């Protein structure tokens, strides 16, 4: 038996084809990164199954593709969409109140033997928060990739003249940093892209 892997990529617009890169700030490089990673993993002999959990969106402003509960990516790989929060598309900063609902849904889903993965890989702070809850409740090892980090964003924006109240209103920066702290505390493995990210950005976390 090979590995069963579950990726959490919760914000933006995610599908298996014709990625809408650059449509907004939430549908960018991370979207392509996750899709290419999943395709590469699915092609490996030691991997039996790899899935991506993302948000199910019912909104006339976006493609009906994002309202499909299940979508194939490749042989042995697919997308599973779960509804949490309002039906409409939301920017990632507005998803925080609904993440525990998603975690509750996934606990029920992943308790079924046919759905339980060997590893959970969470991408970005929102998924890291959900991944930490799942890892703690189900005992499944967690991998965390931040892609970018809240403390670094906070540092740059404050240095550029921003103020704390603005950062909270626009970016929910404290929620993001708290989620990253939780994910890092529970992660069995943390993946970074560069040595600078590892040494200078993650070093700002406890």
Region locations from a protein language model:
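Catalytic cores of nucleotide-sugar-dependent glycosyltransferases that transfer UDP/GDP/TDP-activated
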Residues: 1-206
């Amino acid at each position: 038996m090979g590995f069963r892997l579950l990726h959490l990529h919760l914000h933006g617009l995610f599908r298996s084809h014709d990625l809408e890169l650059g449509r907004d700030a939430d549908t960018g490089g991370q979207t392509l990164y996750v899709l290419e990673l999943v395709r590469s993993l699915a092609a490996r002999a030691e991997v039996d199954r790899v899935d991506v959990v993302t948000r199910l969106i019912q909104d006339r402003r976006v493609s009906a593709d994002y309202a499909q509960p299940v979508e194939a990516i490749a042989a042995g790989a697919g997308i599973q969409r779960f509804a949490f929060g309002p039906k409409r598309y939301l920017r990632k900063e507005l998803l925080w109140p609904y993440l525990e609902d998603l975690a509750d849904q996934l606990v029920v889903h992943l308790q079924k033997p046919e759905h339980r993965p060997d590893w959970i890989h969470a991408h970005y702070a929102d998924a890291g928060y959900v991944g930490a809850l799942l890892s703690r409740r189900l005992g499944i090892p967690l991998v965390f990739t931040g892609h970018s980090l809240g403390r670094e964003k906070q540092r740059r924006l404050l240095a550029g003249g921003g103020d704390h109240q603005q950062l909270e209103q626009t970016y929910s920066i404290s929620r993001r940093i708290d989620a990253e702290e939780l994910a890092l505390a529970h992660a069995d493995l943390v993946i970074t892209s560069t040595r600078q990210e590892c040494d200078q950005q993650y070093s700002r976390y406890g």
